Design a protein with these regions (language model features):
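N-terminal amphipathic alpha-helix/helix-capping segment at the start of soluble metabolic enzymes
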Residues: 1-21
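Active-site-adjacent beta->alpha loops and helix N-cap segments on the catalytic face
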Residues: 3, 32, 55-63, 83-92, ...
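N-terminal active-site wall of soluble small-molecule enzyme domains
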Residues: 8, 30, 48-49, 53-96, ...
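Glycine-rich tight-turn/loop motif centered on a GG-T
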Residues: 18-19, 49-56, 99-116, 142
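Hydrophobic faces of well-ordered beta-strands that scaffold small-molecule active sites
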Residues: 19-25, 45-49, 77-83, 101-103, ...
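Helix C-cap/helix->beta junction micro-motif
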Residues: 41, 73-75, 127
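Glycine-enriched alpha-helix->loop->beta-strand junction motifs that scaffold or abut catalytic
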Residues: 41-43, 95-101
Length: 142
């Protein structure tokens, strides 16, 4: 029950009329805190890791932490690589066990972005991994 695909959580939330929190986790304290709060509220949870935000933590350290914590959770938890900008990073995340990847090709032309997103979808789905694609840019900066 615990480690699930994000699209499953989204479909259930849509049918049930509720939202699923999607929180970033950069260290074990954050991850376990997010899961404990979700368990306390009996809420599903999506845990994400954004390499550009937490560049000091290698994927091979961060993603297994998220995946293993999700598997131990008492509520459904999806794990997602956020803003993967290239095929190799996406593949590494899939091999490390995440249930979802987000491909961010927003710096590419629209046509190239769609093409690469489609290629990633084929590979990811073969491994049972959900894909979110970023096909445009929202103005502003963080």
């Amino acid at each position: 029950m615990s480690h699930v695909r994000i699209d499953k959580l989204q479909r259930q939330a849509g049918k049930g009329g509720y939202a699923v929190p999607h929180l970033l986790g950069s260290n074990i304290e954050m991850v376990l805190g997010h899961i404990r709060a979700a368990e306390d509220k009996q809420s599903p949870l999506a845990l994400g890791f954004a390499p550009e935000v937490f560049s000091m933590i290698p994927l091979e350290v961060s993603l297994p932490m998220l995946v293993n914590a999700a598997k131990r959770a008492k509520v459904p938890v999806a794990t997602q690589l956020e803003h993967g900008h290239d095929f190799d990073t996406i593949m590494q995340a899939i091999q490390l066990g995440v249930s979802s990847v987000m491909f961010d090709g927003s710096d590419l032309s629209y046509e190239e972005n769609v093409k690469q997103t489609q290629e990633i979808v084929k590979v990811a789905h073969a491994f049972g991994v959900a894909v979110e694609g970023e096909l445009g840019c929202v103005g502003g900066s963080a």
